[in-house]
Amino acid sequence: MSSEGEHNNSDLALRSRLIAELRGLRLDTRRLNSSLVERLRPFRKTDGSFKTLPDSRKKKHRKRTPDISVASTCTVLLAAITSGKYEKRHKLFETKSATEIFKQAVVKANWGSSGLEDGNAFTTAIVVRTAGFMVQRGVLPAKEVQALKHAHFKNNENVARKTLKQIVQSKAKKGEDSFAVADYPPKSTHAYWFVDGAIGAGVALPQSTWQKIASWASNEFHRQLIYVTAENDALMDPPSLAMAACLINRIRRLSDEERELASLSRMLPSLVELEVGIEQVFTKQSESGIWHRYFPLFHFPKGGGAADYCFSFEFLEAILTEFGTFVLRNPALLDRVKRVIRWCDTHELEFTDATGKKYRGWSSGGEVRSLAEGKSESWATASVHMFLTQLDRRISDLLDELVLKGFGIDRRAVTESSKKFEQMIDADLRFLGERPTTLKKVIEEEILKKAKALTAEGLIREGLPVPRSVLLFGPPGTSKSRLAKAMAEYLGWPLVTITPSEFLGKGVEHVHAQVDEKFRDLMDLRKAVVFFDEMDALAQTREGDEQSDGRGAGDLDITRQLLTTSMLPKLSSLWDQRRVIFLMATNHKQQLDPAITRPNRFDMLLCVPPPPWTSKSSAESLDGILKIPDPKKVERKLGQLAPPKSRTANRLNAFTVAEVGIFLHHLRRKTNQQTVLEALEQFTDPSEFAKAVENWAVTAITLRSQGQTIREFGKDFNESRRQYYPGEE
């Protein structure tokens, strides 16, 4: 074996091993994350907000100030929004919606966590980040969020009676001072939350402000990187290093998106430096799976010396957001992430209060007495779930990338263009549900536009709507494969083509294993078009077992068994995932196993007929698809020889586009002419051309394979179209 072949095999083995590890880790992550609502709901108070501890006492406030723990409530909101479980149907928010609770926290509540003053850097950063998530996830529009006015009664000039937009802009002007609580130094934790939220909420800041923040973040990163690398226990603060790296990367992403801020990237450490910093953070992970405490964010003014620290899961969530792929691709760091998951498994607390209400979740360890009593914290539990959700998302992103690479596809090289779809010759589907329409119109209106709208609005995480699967049937040569490619380009999604060889290449004895393997890969894809091509051999009924190609009934029984016992359930699972659009093409609709058309497999059964003669003979088709010289003159001559609605045109309606091209070149050769136009000019009488069509039609590819005359094929074709229409949810 050549060194190149050995290298490829080694890469394949490494990729397969990484895929297997990631799938296993994702299973554990989803198992832990599945109880988000059950863990957080017991902390919900009657007003819809969330208390910090099971036994949190009601705080004394003036009548017009609601008793809301803003930091805890917003952190729960962040976890719910990140996971997509913020709607009332998820039963985490029932008496009030997530948007109502957020507005109440922003407008009426005191932004003074743990005795801190209203509008302190810690609480403000959490509120602003929650606002950004609200906008980014489509929960609230940016203008509405920015216009929310903090109307708390206290006369704090920083926040009182100012809109959220004004608060963000006024605080950001102060640069790093905006991220300091009282007399404590500025913290990169507060800075990352604040900046991420401001960007997400669409609050514009001047370039000078960004330069201040970028300069401070770079200095903080380099300072902490030196301390951590030197193992200076007295000065190092790994959480601050992690958050500084995340802050810088967030600013870098902004500078890549906003042309007027492009110069910011020159002020920032390189991506390689940032990744070195992240590696250094993980070197300080304890054996338990999380990090020891270093410097506090602040001390509670009324807490008897108690302090608040950046919880490990808060900076881990930020690391995954900004450097997820880097972490998961690195075997050493991937093992560290697994250690974190083990901590989640072994450190979950359970507590039952005096009323019998049960609480499950995690504690940050900040409340020592509560930890000793086994009481979890709402915000810490929410932070763990934010980490789990982000880990799931980053694993899924990387699996999508790795699986596509296995198919020889790089998503970054995929471009979005509707040109190929627009250039496709349309086909009449007037019998479709008895409504006059066309093939392209049905596909564009029912599938492509809906999927594209969801992608544009960032709502694709909720899943693709019905219809998202199509069975394409029709004679060979009707551009079913080209249609799949055009659909993928229209959306800007990769096209993954699956043929029978993917399942049968290793022999019949390995068919089920191959089906399992390929569909595991397909289940890891998102925003992709999957095209099952040439699947007729795997979809035949017993009535179609005896074929003229010489295959025995036993062979076809095996392929039929493959479909019914392996592929069909997998198609249903792929449909349930709601992450891809998948198509299957067949030339033999009548021979399909009826099970394939059942609900939750194919939402829509569409005939892909030969386009009408007028479309096939158009200059656009002759030039763009068939590449015939002098297309306009050829179109004009064909219009004279086979005018619309003539008997000859009706015959030519049954020809595929490819067959029209073959026929025209057949005429050129038969008449010994140099061009198609010269060949057509040999026909002065339309009846002579009609006879040439009839003589050639008996050998046409489509008709020969169907074993039918033009008239018989057209009759059966029209009848079959009446039976199929778009599926409905």
Predicted features and spans:
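C-terminal engagement/docking regions of AAA+ P-loop ATPases
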Residues: 457-462, 678-729
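Dynamic helix-loop-helix/coil hinge segments at AAA+ ATPase domain boundaries and subdomain interfaces
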Residues: 420-445
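Walker A/P-loop NTP-binding motif of AAA+ ATPase domains
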Residues: 436-636
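Surface-exposed intrinsically disordered loops and tails
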Residues: 288, 292-302, 346-369, 643, ...
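Conserved AAA+ ATPase small/helical "lid" subdomain
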Residues: 630-697, 704
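An alpha-helical repeat/solenoid feature that recognizes helix-turn-helix modules
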Residues: 2-27, 31, 56-89, 112-143, ...
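Long, well-ordered core segments of solenoidal/helical folds
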Residues: 22, 26-54, 91-114, 144-178, ...
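A short, basic N-terminal segment
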Residues: 384, 398-429
